[in-house]
């Protein structure tokens, strides 16, 4: 199946009419005939007419986005319930394949076998992966080759990179994490990393790096606060502007994977994707620090 951008929703979604009655338990995906929705357009004439439920599971990196979208969407459509669980990208896609959820959230591109199973790759936003350092680190810029060397265990002390004589503590996510998968794939070091700590959430990585001298880790750009330093990569800062311009090499899609075409889904699920493509939905995406796909 071809990669789809949510902003380019198939024409069938618009003609199918989201005016609608209750939602079914079907799952969703983008269609093959792409047609862009007009900004802010909605085909649901009365918000109170839409009802039903939407279930999501998957990436912990997408927690802020999923929660923000669920909250704002339920305010717009009070008779729709949106639930989200944060089980990791691979688990989320497995859940949508199994039919136990409507949407599988993945913070990486879908694998070929996942697409072959019928999952559509609906990209709703772009995220930058920031390299985070402990606050005392004097090294503030890293090259791609240096990152590879650090994570493969070849460079072991910050003094080798012009910093203080401090051992490098390599922190990462657990196997199955979308962030880890995206990071290792972007650097082409899958299954070659030597981790001192493998943690099960974005928050845990940031907390570990913030409290550990010499630590380095990776996390979603939107999760970075003032407890850690976000390193520049090859002189390019980790900002939304640089990522959207294609100048920052550690970036990835945020995917809401679904089974079948969007036009085949429940009215509630179709309305959610239309909402994400609207001006209102794009504002929600921006507010959590992500980049829209338009």
Predicted regions span which residues?
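Exported/periplasmic ABC-transporter solute-binding proteins
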Residues: 22-98, 102-294
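Hydrophobic helical h-region of N-terminal Sec-dependent signal peptides
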Residues: 10-15
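Positively charged n-region of N-terminal signal peptides that target proteins for export
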Residues: 1-5, 9
């Amino acid at each position: 199946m071809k990669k789809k951008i949510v902003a380019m929703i198939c024409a069938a979604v618009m003609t199918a009419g989201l005016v609608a009655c209750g939602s079914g338990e079907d799952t969703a995906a983008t269609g093959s005939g792409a047609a862009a929705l007009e900004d802010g357009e909605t085909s649901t004439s009365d918000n109170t007419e839409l009802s039903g439920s939407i279930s999501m599971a998957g990436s912990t990196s997408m927690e802020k986005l999923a929660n923000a979208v669920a909250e704002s969407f339920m305010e717009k459509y009070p008779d729709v319930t949106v639930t989200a669980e944060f089980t990791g990208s691979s688990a989320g896609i497995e859940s949508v394949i199994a039919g136990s959820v409507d949407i599988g959230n993945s913070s990486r591109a879908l694998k070929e076998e996942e697409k072959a199973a019928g999952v559509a790759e609906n990209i709703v936003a772009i995220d930058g992966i920031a390299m985070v350092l402990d606050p005392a680190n004097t090294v503030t810029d890293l090259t791609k080759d240096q990152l590879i060397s650090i994570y493969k265990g070849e460079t072991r002390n910050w003094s080798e990179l012009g910093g203080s004589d401090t051992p490098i503590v390599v922190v990462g996510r657990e196997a199955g994490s979308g962030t880890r998968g995206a990071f290792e794939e972007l650097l082409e070091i899958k299954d070659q990393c030597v981790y001192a700590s493998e943690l099960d959430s974005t928050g845990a990585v940031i907390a570990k790096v913030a409290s550990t001298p010499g630590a380095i880790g990776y996390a979603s750009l939107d999760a970075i606060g003032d407890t850690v330093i976000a390193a520049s990569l090859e002189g390019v800062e980790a900002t939304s502007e640089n990522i959207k311009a294609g100048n920052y090499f550690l970036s990835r899609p945020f995917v809401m994977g679904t089974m079948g075409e969007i036009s085949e889904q429940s009215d509630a699920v179709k309305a959610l994707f239309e909402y994400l493509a609207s001006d209102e939905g794009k504002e929600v995406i921006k507010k959590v620090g992500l980049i829209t796909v338009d």
